[in-house]
């Protein structure tokens, strides 16, 4: 089980990403638009830098929905390998069969 503070910190970051997504996209579009003047683009970059750092989607960490584990994360199931193995062994994941040879 991951530290609760780490999981909560990531949840807060996800909330900030969602909150600032529109504003960030607008400013990025202005900053990358080559038809505008350099001053306007630079101003957009400065405003982009003023946004909270944790509102950047890059700072989000994929975490297991069950344990909060940050590593060995399976995107398709949103779980870590350990959680997938445990639930798969119990037969709680449809279509997942434990292999044996």
Curated annotation (Swiss-Prot):
GO terms for biological process: translation. Pfam families: Ribosomal_S14. InterPro entries: Ribosomal_uS14, Ribosomal_uS14_bac/plastid, Ribosomal_uS14_CS. GO terms for cellular component: cytoplasm; small ribosomal subunit. One of its GO terms (molecular function) is structural constituent of ribosome. The keyword RNA-binding applies. Keywords: Ribonucleoprotein, Ribosomal protein, RNA-binding, rRNA-binding. It comes from the Bacteria. PANTHER family: 30S RIBOSOMAL PROTEIN S14, SMALL RIBOSOMAL SUBUNIT PROTEIN US14M. NCBIfam families: PRK08881.1. Belongs to the universal ribosomal protein uS14 family. Part of the 30S ribosomal subunit. Contacts proteins S3 and S10. This is Small ribosomal subunit protein uS14. It comes from Beijerinckia indica subsp. indica (strain ATCC 9039 / DSM 1715 / NCIMB 8712).
